Amino acid sequence: MEDRVEISLLMDFYGPLLTEKQSEIMQWYYNDDLSLAEIAELNQTSRQAIHDLIKRCYKQLLSYESKLNLLQKSINRKKEIMNFLEHLKNKYSIDDEDIIKYKEKLENL
């Protein structure tokens, strides 16, 4: 089942690997919330053609993720950072403001 958040994240990682037209249509459909009919009208094509293109792009994004795992690695990295910061907070009594600063620094690495 496709989840809009998952697709947006996949687009963040792998969107540049799609063609300009594919990327634009995915952006319109998932981020700008345009309907298939609206996108079809903008592209002077049928709703079915847009639907098929979106499904192909989604499968392509999943294929990239299955091979490269960039999204999953990023999610795992963020979890590890949060666990590490929570450990620091508990062990060394670091306040939340400092934790936020450390988190931002680690995420920018």
From Swiss-Prot:
Domain of life of the organism encoding this protein: Bacteria
Gene3D superfamilies to which the protein is assigned, alphabetical: Winged helix-like DNA-binding domain superfamily/Winged helix DNA-binding domain
Family matches, as InterPro entries: RNA_pol_sigma_r3/r4-like, UPF0122, UPF0122_fam_protein, WH-like_DNA-bd_sf
Signal peptide region: none
A Pfam family reported for this protein in Swiss-Prot or TrEMBL: UPF0122
SUPFAM superfamilies: Sigma3 and sigma4 domains of RNA polymerase sigma factors
NCBIfam families membership: PRK00118.2-2, YlxM
HAMAP family on file: UPF0122 (MF_00245)
PANTHER family reported in the protein's UniProt record: UPF0122 PROTEIN CBO2450/CLC_2298, UPF0122 PROTEIN YLXM
Family under the similarity heading: Belongs to the UPF0122 family.
Entry function: Might take part in the signal recognition particle (SRP) pathway. This is inferred from the conservation of its genetic proximity to ftsY/ffh. May be a regulatory protein.
Protein name per its UniProtKB record: UPF0122 protein Cbei_1174
Origin species: Clostridium beijerinckii (strain ATCC 51743 / NCIMB 8052) (Clostridium acetobutylicum)
Lineage of origin: Bacteria, Bacillati, Bacillota, Clostridia, Eubacteriales
